[in-house]
């Protein structure tokens, strides 16, 4: 079953795209452990799956760990179809909480909560690779239960929609009304359109153009 808000676009339709080995502690260990530990040593965090509580706990822990050196940037690479709002908000709040600049880089796709985290990077340090795709849309959830429960959940969803629109407006420079209109249905952006809208600050074909080389040492 698809997680609320998580989408992946491919030829022929929408499919699930999960990568449970992202952000450390890969299943089975071995080479995957070495790769993600090496990335973390370079201050790189990778979100390469739908956002859920497990990945949010890992990423927030990594952000807090890297925040021990507050003068160095942290690099968050994003290839995500979106996912849980509450899990994503845990990552978002931690990004705002720490003193470090958080450089965000979209690769592949940053959709829904993936887009939200991308746009929440430090102003001037939000990037996309040339062929990334970015999606904004309103929060969604399946509602079930008694009429009273459905009413409570619907009211909460409207509150969440309003809050997400306010924060997206803050990070993009758009008005809340504009964001609300644009996210009423799926709206896809290529990197040029995303830059014009304020979702990102620049398009980077190579790591050499990013602050600190994007954590790759290419600068």
UniProtKB/Swiss-Prot annotation:
UniProt keyword terms in alphabetical order: Cytoplasm, Hydrolase, Protease, Serine protease
UniProt-listed InterPro entries: ClpP, ClpP/crotonase-like_dom_sf, ClpP/TepA, ClpP_His_AS
Statement: the UniProt record of this protein carries the keyword rRNA processing: no
GO CC term, one of those recorded: endopeptidase Clp complex
Record's catalysed reaction(s): Hydrolysis of proteins to small peptides in the presence of ATP and magnesium. alpha-casein is the usual test substrate. In the absence of ATP, only oligopeptides shorter than five residues are hydrolyzed (such as succinyl-Leu-Tyr-|-NHMec, and Leu-Tyr-Leu-|-Tyr-Trp, in which cleavage of the -Tyr-|-Leu- and -Tyr-|-Trp bonds also occurs)
Any one GO biological process: protein quality control for misfolded or incompletely synthesized proteins
Major subcellular location class: cytoplasm
Compartments, as annotated in UniProt: Cytoplasm
Entry keyword Protease: yes
Active site positions, chain numbering: 112, 137
The EC number(s) this enzyme carries: 3.4.21.92
GO molecular function, one term: serine-type endopeptidase activity
Disulphide connectivity of cysteines: none
Domain of life of the source: Bacteria
Subunit structure: Fourteen ClpP subunits assemble into 2 heptameric rings which stack back to back to give a disk-like structure with a central cavity, resembling the structure of eukaryotic proteasomes.
Described purpose of this protein according to its UniProt entry: Cleaves peptides in various proteins in a process that requires ATP hydrolysis. Has a chymotrypsin-like activity. Plays a major role in the degradation of misfolded proteins.
Family: Belongs to the peptidase S14 family.
Identification of the protein by name: ATP-dependent Clp protease proteolytic subunit 3
Gene: clpP3
């Amino acid at each position: 079953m698809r997680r609320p808000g998580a989408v992946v676009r491919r030829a022929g339709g929408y499919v699930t795209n999960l990568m449970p080995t992202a952000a450390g502690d890969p299943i089975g260990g071995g080479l995957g452990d070495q790769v993600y530990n090496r990335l973390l040593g370079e201050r790189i965090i990778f979100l390469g799956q739908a956002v859920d509580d497990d990945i949010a706990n890992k990423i927030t822990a990594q952000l807090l760990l890297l925040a021990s050196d507050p003068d160095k940037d942290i690099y968050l690479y994003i290839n995500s179809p979106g996912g849980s709002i509450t899990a994503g908000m845990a990552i978002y709040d931690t990004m705002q909480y720490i003193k470090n600049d958080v450089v965000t880089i979209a690769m592949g796709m940053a959709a829904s909560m993936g887009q939200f985290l991308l746009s929440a990077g430090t102003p001037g340090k939000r990037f996309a690779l040339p062929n990334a795709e970015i999606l904004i849309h309103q929060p969604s959830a399946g509602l079930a239960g008694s009429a009273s429960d459905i009413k409570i959940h619907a009211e909460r969803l409207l509150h969440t929609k309003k809050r997400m629109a306010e924060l997206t407006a803050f990070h993009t420079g758009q008005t809340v009304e504009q964001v609300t209109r644009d996210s009423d249905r799926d709206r896809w952006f290529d990197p040029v359109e995303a830059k014009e809208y304020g979702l990102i600050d620049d398009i980077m074909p190579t790591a050499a153009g990013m602050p600190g080389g994007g954590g790759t040492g290419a600068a």
